[in-house]
Amino acid sequence: MASNKTTLQKMGKKQNGKSKKVEEAEPEEFVVEKVLDRRVVNGKVEYFLKWKGFTDADNTWEPEENLDCPELIEDFLNSQKAGKEKDGTKRKSLSDSESDDSKSKKKRDAADKPRGFARGLDPERIIGATDSSGELMFLMKWKDSDEADLVLAKEANMKCPQIVIAFYEERLTWHSCPEDEAQ
């Protein structure tokens, strides 16, 4: 993506001197109006963007490396910092120390991140199973994701029974009795 200023200049040139066909020949250049949100997916930062001249229904998540609008990203990050500082001052009066606040923030971030089926991804296969928490859980690999999550077996049984069956079938072993072989 081109920077906000660069893209606007290019668009101006297109409108002043070149035909509409040239505009259509470069459909990959769009102008970012505003950065709305930020997330990390598979270790890569993505931004939720409002595109200039498009409706909110056309907003998209784009990887940071595809973007060249540092001013808009900086504005967004500064607004996020300002919002967190306001919240932080309220929490500081309630918490005993800075270190406690940063530890609880990390826990909140981890707790806020959707896990399992809440991520809205389709299950690909079950990698393993455990009952270390007292309940049977499956380690689920998701389609189009490198991350795996522990999900309750009860939930997997309801939401993806064929994947659960495939997991058990892979581990099924048959033992024949000597009497059966004689017949």
UniProtKB/Swiss-Prot annotation:
Q: Tell me what this protein is called.
A: Chromobox protein homolog 3
Kindly list the biological process annotations in GO that this record carries: DNA damage response; heterochromatin formation; negative regulation of DNA-templated transcription; rhythmic process
Kindly give the InterPro entries that the UniProt entry links to this protein: CBX3_chromo_domain, Chromo-like_dom_sf, Chromo/chromo_shadow_dom, Chromo_dom_subgr, Chromo_domain, Chromo_shadow_dom, Chromodomain_CS, Heterochromatin_chromo-domain
PTM sites of type Phosphoserine: 93, 95, 97, 99, 176
The source organism is Mus musculus (Mouse)
Q: Give every Chromo domain span.
A: 30-88, 121-179
Q: Which domain of life is it from?
A: Eukaryota
Q: Where in the sequence is N-acetylalanine found?
A: 2
Modification note: Phosphorylated by PIM1. Phosphorylated during interphase and possibly hyper-phosphorylated during mitosis.
Q: Keywords on this record?
A: Acetylation, Biological rhythms, Chromatin regulator, Isopeptide bond, Nucleus, Phosphoprotein, Repeat, Repressor, Transcription, Transcription regulation, Ubl conjugation
According to the UniProt record, one GO cellular component term is: chromocenter
Q: What is its main location?
A: nucleus
One Pfam family per UniProt = Chromo_shadow
**Gene3D superfamilies per the UniProt record, alphabetical:** 2.40.50.40
Keyword Repressor assigned: yes
